[in-house]
Every structure is written in structure tokens, then in C-alpha cells.
A protein has these predicted regions:
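Conserved Rossmann-fold cofactor-binding substructure of NAD(P)-dependent oxidoreductases
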Residues: 81-93
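Rossmann-fold cofactor-recognition segment
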Residues: 70-82
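Conserved N-terminal Rossmann-fold NAD(P)-binding element of oxidoreductases
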Residues: 24-29
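Helix N-cap at the beta1-alpha1 junction of Rossmann-like dinucleotide-binding domains, i.e.
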Residues: 55-57
Length: 419
């Protein structure tokens, strides 16, 4: 065991790694668990991984579970992702080729700073969000473009499902089926049931901040803002059925509006059941979704962070959750002067995900693309210095990898459109 600046690193599996790939995975939650499992399944690319988190025992648990089942060498470390010197010390000791950030969005910039100092490629699944402001956008990370270019390293932003696969779907549609895409509707449906009166399928703090914020969409190059849950539609999803869905603000709209030719409107919809919305409204009404600190028994606490502590851990939902997810994009545009529509989507089964990696499908659909994005960079298919959104790269190898690694996609050339 080696200790550096308060960082405990299990060094048992340290080895010379010429012509091998070394990945540092920061985070130990539900999505991180999927990334770790999929990297270990893909040992030809991920020959060595280091799992690092504030709580090293969580990392050690993954190592104990997987080390005898994989050819990937697994190391664990304790690190505070809010502390750039700690991150730098860990990277200098472990010497990763790439850092897969599946920690909190608040920590993106700290991790990017460490990657810059150590010249390590970077992948994340969600854009930066200031902890004290429920507002997420790409401007903070896009500001790193020139520095990453000069350092000769690649930052791949948003390599989850949405953002992530949805951007790849857009690039694929643009490359193969359209001369210009005028309308995109991103539909995120979770038809799963975990049996709890109220729980979130990913980090409760991030999830509740997202769905309680004002909605927005892009129309003719401008943001149009709506009240939370103001715009509702009903859609019949393949293998899930008819669901209520609501327009939300979502980060990929910002980059897709810049990178997809001919865009007139982009919207994002997510399904919610009535029980979830009723509970959320009650929590909002009593102040439990607030991010403003309050005084409690002589201490400052953030109500939403307290709520997160009492809600079920999303990583614990796997064995309870039944049903399927359906996430995809509906496109309208032009090809050879004619109107064209196209729908590409993935259906994922919660129970099948749990059988494979011990996770529900929400974490699975985020973690698999994070591994694939890292693989694209490590194998040179997407290696390009700078800070890039996922739709800026050739979608074909990523689309092939989705089929191989557990997220097969389907196409419909005559879909029902969203009004």
C-alpha cells in the first residue's frame, strides 16, 4: 500500500504497461459500477483500471467482486474529487492514459484541471453544474478548448446516454439519412417500477434539481423557456406502452443546435408517473428541494442534500426494478429535396441489466456509453486534441460498439411524430 498526500493507493497490481491502456475511473456509485464492469469485460482495451472515490471501501468492493473474473488489473484509491492537488498526485502516481469522470457534475472542472496538468485524456457523462446554482450549461467546459488543444489531449463531453448516445444518434442520422435536419425530439422513457412510493433512478440531488427547474427548448436559434412540467405530451413507446412525458431543459440541446445542420427546433421529453410528480410537488411545497442552506441545530444544511441522504440509494434499486427503458431521437428534415422522418432508439431491460452487472437500466444506459467513449479515444478512433461534444465525431464505430456492448438500437422510418 502506497500513500501520497493523503491518498491511499492499492499498488498490488502495478506493472509495466507499454502498449496497454490505463484508465482512472473517478466515482463509485451506480453508473461507476457499470463502467467498471464493462471495462473489465473489455480487457483487450482496458488492461489496467484504477477505481478512485472519496470512500475507498466502495472501490475495494468492486475490486473484490471482479478481480478474479477479469484479465483487467484493478487498483483502488481514495481521492477527494474537489481537491485538484489530490487528483494531480493520484494521476502522477497511477499515470493513466484516460480519466473517466463518473463523479458529480460539480466536480467536472476540478478533474479537467488535473487532467490538463497531467496531460490525461478526459471523458464525462454530464456537463458542469455549479453546486450553489441549479443551472447547467457547457460554457464552463467549452472554455477549456484551447488549453486542451495546446496540451495535446482530448476531452469528450457527455458520453452517457442523454447526453451521449442521443448525440451519436444525431450525428448518425445527419451522416446517413439527411441533407439537413430541421426538427429533433429526444424522448427518454423509463417504464420501470422499483416498488418505492418515491425514489430517483440516479443521484437524487442531480435528478431533482433537473426536473424541478424550468423547462426550455431551442426554436429558430433561440432558447424558449417554460414553467417546470408545463408542456406535456403522451407517446406510445415500443415495448413500454403509452406514457406521459414532459418537456425539460437538457444539456445536449445546446451543443446539438451548433453541430447539426439545418436545425429549427430541438426538444427533450422525459416520462414521469403521477406518483413521482405528486411526491415531488409535496417536497417542493415544504422546501425540501431547496439548495439554499438553512440553520439546523447550530449547523448549516442544504435541504436537498438532506433529502438525498434519506432517499433510497439509486445503486440499491437494481434488484427491485422491473420493466424497460426506451430512449431515442425522432428526426424530421430533408433528403434529396424531399421530406424525411427517422426514429432511432434503444430499449433496455432493467432485470437483464441487473443479471449482467448488478445495476438497473438507468445506470446501465449511462455507464456503457461512458466505457465506449473512453474506448473510442484509447483506440485512436476519436483521438482529437481539444474539448469536444460527442456528435462532433464519426458516429459509425460508436454505433457498432453499442450493438456489441449491450445497447442495441432500432430504426423506424415512419414514426409517430410529437406535436
Amino acid at each position: 500500500m502506497l500513500s501520497i498526500i493523503g491518498i491511499a493507493v492499492d499498488n498490488k497490481f502495478r506493472k509495466e504497461w507499454s502498449n496497454m491502456s490505463r484508465a482512472l475511473i473517478i466515482g463509485a456509485g451506480g453508473v461507476a459500477g457499470v463502467v467498471i464492469h464493462k471495462c473489465c469485460q473489455n480487457s483487450e482495451v482496458f488492461t489496467d483500471i484504477c477505481i478512485a472515490s472519496r470512500t475507498k471501501s466502495k472501490c475495494d468492493k468492486f475490486k473484490e467482486e471482479l478481480q478474479d473474473k477479469t484479465k483487467t488489473n484493478i487498483t483502488t484509491a481514495q481521492v477527494n474529487a474537489d481537491n485538484v492537488p489530490e487528483l494531480v498526485a493520484l494521476m502522477k502516481e497511477y499515470k493513466p492514459d484516460i480519466c473517466i469522470n463518473v463523479a458529480l457534475p460539480y466536480q467536472d472542472l476540478h478533474i479537467m484541471d488535473a487532467c490538463l496538468e497531467c496531460k490525461v485524456d478526459y471523458v464525462d457523462t454530464a456537463n458542469y453544474e455549479p453546486e450553489d446554482t441549479a443551472k447547467f450549461e457547457y460554457k464552463w467546459q467549452w472554455a477549456y478548448r484551447e488549453r486542451f488543444e495546446k496540451a495535446g489531449i482530448t476531452a469528450l463531453l457527455g458520453s452517457g446516454f442523454d447526453p451521449g448516445v442521443t448525440g451519436v444518434f444525431c450525428a448518425y442520422a445527419q451522416k446517413h439519412y439527411f441533407d439537413e435536419i430541421n426538427y429533433i425530439d429526444i424522448l427518454d422513457c423509463n417504464g420501470g417500477d422499483h416498488g418505492y412510493p418515491f425514489a430517483t433512478n440516479f443521484n437524487p440531488e442531480i435528478n431533482i434539481r433537473e426536473v424541478s427547474a424550468k423547462g426550455s427548448y431551442i426554436q429558430d436559434g433561440k432558447w424558449v423557456e417554460t414553467e417546470p412540467m408545463e408542456i406535456k405530451r403522451v407517446y406510445n413507446f415500443d415495448q413500454v406502452g403509452e406514457k406521459d412525458m414532459y418537456l425539460l431543459h437538457h444539456e445536449e440541446l445546446e451543443s446539438l443546435a451548433l453541430n447539426i445542420k439545418g436545425i429549427k427546433r430541438i426538444r427533450f421529453f422525459m416520462t414521469f408517473g403521477q406518483s413521482y410528480l405528486t411526491h415531488l410537488k409535496c417536497l417542493e411545497d415544504v422546501g425540501m428541494t431547496s439548495i439554499e442552506p438553512i440553520d439546523f441545530e447550530g449547523k448549516k444544511i442544504v435541504p436537498l442534500q438532506f433529502l438525498k441522504a434519506v432517499l433510497p440509494d439509486p445503486a440499491s434499486l437494481g434488484p427491485r426494478t422491473k420493466g424497460k427503458t426506451n430512449i431515442g431521437c425522432i428526426f424530421q428534415g430533408k433528403k434529396d429535396g424531399k421530406d424525411k422522418t427517422y426514429y432511432v432508439y434503444n430499449v433496455c431491460d432493467h432485470q437483464e441489466c441487473y443479471k449482467e452487472v448488478g445495476s438497473q437500466a438507468i445506470s446501465y444506459t449511462t455507464g456503457v456509453p461512458a466505457m465506449i467513449g473512453a474506448m473510442m479515444i484509447l483506440t485512436g478512433k476519436w483521438k482529437k486534441p481539444g474539448v469536444h461534444n460527442i456528435e462532433e465525431f464519426d458516429p459509425d464505430p460508436f454505433m457498432d460498439a453499442l450493438n456489441k456492448w449491450g445497447l442495441p438500437w432500432k430504426e423506424n422510418f415512419d414514426p409517430v411524430l410529437v406535436d
